[in-house]
Design a protein with these regions (language model features):
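Short Fe-S-cluster ligation motifs
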Residues: 4-20, 29, 43, 47, ...
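Local cysteine-cluster metal-coordination motifs and their immediate loop/turn environment
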Residues: 44-66, 89-110
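Glycine-rich dinucleotide-binding loop and its adjacent helix/turn
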Residues: 123-140, 198-218, 241-305, 420-435
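Conserved hydrophobic helix-helix packing surfaces used for dimerization/oligomerization
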Residues: 146-148, 169, 286, 439
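FAD-site-proximal beta/loop scaffold in flavoenzymes
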Residues: 250-283, 363, 375-449
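A conserved FAD-binding loop/helix module that cradles the flavin
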Residues: 295-300, 305, 445-476
């Protein structure tokens, strides 16, 4: 332990966000650079806690105290080696992960936790700048081939692990570019896409073959995949959005979040798309249904498009400001948080149920809603409408960001005959193999809507299962 008293000497400090009046006029990442000397002090706050519960909070099992100590000692090259041993893509998690590791930090019991996420971000960015992140092609090829369906974080993690183990890996993606949700679902102000592209270049140099623009199940069937490859990993994500079943849903001006975010990401990438006035928030009254990260992504995008006003409505009650007895340490607390998008403007309101939508000439004009109360009935929280609280809100653009229900049914899932669970997710065993021998699955397609860090962990675990299936044993690491 480099600085046993660091947590007593230094307060928690994180990077500042760029001024709101500046950043809402561009699509660049929102955080300012963090001075190296201040980061060393933040790493020094990692205490000699004996049992590092941050491990339990990290799905990929990052050895966090080790690389905190190495950063404090300025041993950056060793730090990135330790970090890459458990996490293929720390540049993604360092930007996009909600950091459940910090929620489990022992220091966080009675103090502010260590800035684990920021240290992770600085390690990987320093490594890229120093030229330490290089392709790691295998020394020996196995002669086995694997098809990975889906190029989100789960599919990419699985592909990289398998390629490094010596297998020939082909990643299929139905979109025109590789990256899945990272490419078209995450706004640039959270992660600029050159961050993704440089990692894909590394993977190509390691032998991974990318095939964008191929819709597996349509352009190539499940049977064709099985005939051409020795194993398959299904990592297509949970892409079926939760819909709003109310009168007026079919009015122009109502869109799923991904229908709204994807075109803007494509324009930021330089694509020339036909202009759709209904999908442009400029000068519009916007309502977002859903209070999660996707809703915040829509909020930040609407700000940058020049929305007149934005409301974000949530069905659930407003979260508490700090942990309650129902959220004991080291669990991840569901508390009230202010994202960069919320800092930029807009109104959040809670306990609101949409009853219907109305419009003129087929175009959305108003949202009609009622306020709710949540009551305990036999140990269950049940919502009740509050009489007399009905209201209507003028709206030009309504965005549905209410989560995802699971993978899209039919298609390659039916063609391969994999078994689904009660929620419609692909069932798998401990090795991530489905009910069909040689067909594996990873990420949101099997666990349901979740975090990027869980997708990476799932992809690594699936790669381990596939390697064992193909070779009889595996040297790939187990994911915690």
């Amino acid at each position: 332990m480099a600085k046993p008293t660091g947590f007593l000497e230094y307060a928690r400090e994180t990077p500042r966000r760029r001024p709101v009046e500046e950043r809402v006029h561009d699509w660049l990442e929102v955080y300012e650079e963090f001075p190296r000397e201040r980061l060393n002090k933040q790493a020094a706050r990692c205490m000699d806690c004996g049992i590092p519960f941050c491990h339990s909070g990290c799905p990929v099992g990052n050895v966090i105290p080790d690389w905190n100590d190495l950063v404090y000692r300025d041993r950056w090259r060793e730090a990135i080696e330790r970090l890459h041993a458990t996490n293929n893509f720390p540049e993604f998690t360092g930007r996009l992960c909600p950091a459940p590791c910090e929620a489990a930090c022992v220091l966080g019991i009675n103090n502010d936790p260590v800035t684990i996420k920021q240290v992770e971000y600085e390690i990987i960015e320093h490594a890229w700048a120093a030229g330490w992140v290089k392709p790691q092609p295998p020394k020996v090829r196995t002669g086995k081939s694997v098809a990975v369906v889906g190029s989100g974080p789960a599919g990419l993690a699985c592909a990289q692990q398998l390629a490094r183990a010596g297998h020939s890996v082909t990643v299929f993606e139905r979109a025109d570019r590789i990256g899945g949700l990272l490419r078209y679902g995450i706004p640039d102000f959270k992660m600029e896409k050159h961050v993704l592209d440089r990692r894909l270049q590394q993977m190509e140099a390691e032998g991974v073959v990318f095939r964008p623009g191929v819709n597996v199940g349509h352009d190539i069937t499940g049977d064709e995949l099985r005939a051409k490859f020795d194993a398959i990993c299904l990592a297509g994500g949970a892409t079926k959005p939760r819909d709003l079943d109310v009168p007026g849903r079919d009015l122009r001006g109502v869109y799923f979040a991904m229908e709204y975010l994807t075109p803007q990401n494509r324009r930021n990438a330089g694509d020339e798309l036909p202009y759709d006035p209904f999908l442009d928030a400029k000068g519009k009254r916007v309502i977002i249904l859903g209070g999660g990260d996707t809703g915040a992504d829509c909020l930040g995008t609407a700000h940058r498009q020049g929305a007149r006003e934005v409301y974000q409505y949530e069905l659930l009650p407003k979260p508490p400001l700090s942990r309650t007895e129902a959220m004991p340490w080291p669990t991840y607390p569901m508390i009230y948080r202010v994202s960069s998008a919320h800092e930029e403007g807009g109104e959040r309101d809670y306990c609101i149920l949409t009853k219907r939508l109305s419009g003129e000439n087929g175009v959305l004009k108003k949202l009609h809603a009622v306020r709710l109360e949540w009551v305990n009935e036999g140990g269950r929280q049940v919502m009740r409408e509050i009489p007399g609280t009905e209201f209507e809100q003028e709206v030009d653009l309504l965005l549905l960001a209410m989560g995802f229900l699971g993978p899209e049914p039919g298609g390659v899932l039916d063609q391969l005959g994999v078994e689904l669970d009660a929620r419609g997710n692909v069932k798998s065993d401990a090795n991530k193999m489905t009910s069909v021998p040689g067909v594996f699955t990873a990420g949101d397609m099997t666990r349901g809507q979740s975090l990027i860090v869980w997708a990476i962990a799932e992809g690594r675990q699936a790669a381990r299962g596939i390697d064992r299936y193909l070779m009889g044993d595996t040297v790939l690491p187990n994911t915690c």
